[in-house]
Regions:
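Short Pro/Gly-enriched beta-strand edge/turn motifs at strand-loop
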Residues: 13-18, 105-109
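Short, surface-exposed beta-strand-loop junctions and turns on beta-sheet-rich folds
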Residues: 50-52, 71, 140-142
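Alpha-helix boundary recognition
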Residues: 11-12, 57-58, 102
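Short amphipathic alpha-helical segments
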Residues: 3-7, 51, 56-60
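Extreme N-terminal tail/first-helix region
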Residues: 1-16, 151-161
Length: 161
């Protein structure tokens, strides 16, 4: 099984993710719409006043999942990740990812203008260190597999996931 290909095939199917952040030992989870690039970095937009944005400013380590809703009796398939998040403050960085938001989410034409306003929605990047995929990949047995990415731990064993 090629876990990277599983991830690449699954990401286009889902437009929102659950994002976990933490500050001062107080965890938080929220839903955000996301886009991704060829290197499997994740991007989202948010106001800096939101709790998850404040958490990221204090503690950039994040985790989350990207899961398609399923019905009773249907075996779930999902992606999980851990990595670091950062505010993209550089205009060139924002300009580089703007097309991803327009193509995937139909974002408005003025999202760069809005991001130039400190009170507007800003661009955030998540550099994923480890991906995990959960589902039935090779037969009838469900499994969770790990893919180290961008300097993540090299173990393919997902028992710690």
């Amino acid at each position: 099984m090629n876990i990277e290909q599983v991830i690449r095939d699954y990401l286009p199917q889902i437009i929102h993710m659950s994002l976990g952040t933490s500050q001062d030992n107080k965890p938080w989870v929220c839903e955000v719409h996301f886009v991704y690039d060829d290197n499997l970095n994740l991007y989202f937009r948010s106001l800096t006043s939101r709790r998850h944005s404040q958490d990221i400013a204090a503690n950039p380590r994040v985790a989350g999942n990207i899961v398609k809703q399923h019905v009773v009796g249907e075996y779930p398939l999902g992606l999980y990740f851990e990595g670091t998040a950062e505010l993209l403050g550089n205009e060139d960085e924002r300009r580089a990812v703007e097309p991803l938001f327009k193509e995937r989410l139909g974002a408005a034409a003025d999202i760069l203008t809005e991001a130039a306003n400190p009170d507007g929605h800003q661009f955030y990047k998540i550099t994923v260190a480890n991906w995990y995929a959960f589902g039935k990949f090779d037969g009838d047995k469900g499994q969770k597999v790990k893919l180290a990415w961008n300097g993540g731990t090299a173990s393919q064993d997902a028992t710690d996931a």
